[in-house]
Amino acid sequence: MLFMMPSLEDRANSGLEMAMEGVESYLSLGIPKNKLVLGLPWYGYRYTCIQYFQNNNTCVIEKVEFQGAPCSDAAGRQFTYAYIKNLMNEKNITQVWENDTATPYYNYEDPSVSDGTIQMRYDNPHSLKIKIDYAMNLGLLGAGMWNANSLDPSDSAYAILQRAEMWGVMP
């Protein structure tokens, strides 16, 4: 799963370049393309910015290691896609698109944290489709997600649309 690669960045945990790097590393080991499935998250990470630079939208996060390796996931907290979208709607937050990782994110203010800025990093149907298209065009066996219960299970029109959009991009 590409999103489990160690890093200490306040960036997407499953950016396009990371997907490409991960796939290439398996291919360089001689793993056949038709045996690989690209794993993608249906969740995201919430990071508390210990310092936030608005001029270049950089969120400096706490330096945390996991099993001896730098790990941004350990510095953040995982949230479901349903939670991420609900918070975005509830607080009327505008999503930002990061071109070099092909992923969305957003910032919001929380007065209970040191700098006050929280950054939420996640994938949405558009970013997932870009990565899935990459996998399929490369000739991989497929793409999968973790995990299906990250979506809103209710019968609301919004939840039904959310599920249709997310499942709609899967191969």
What kind of region is each of these model predictions?
Residues 1, 141-146:
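Short acidic catalytic loops
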Residues 18-21, 127, 159:
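Acidic, Ser/Thr-rich intrinsically disordered and amphipathic helical segments
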Residues 134, 149-171:
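Aromatic-rich peripheral "rim/lid" segments of glycoside hydrolase catalytic domains that contact
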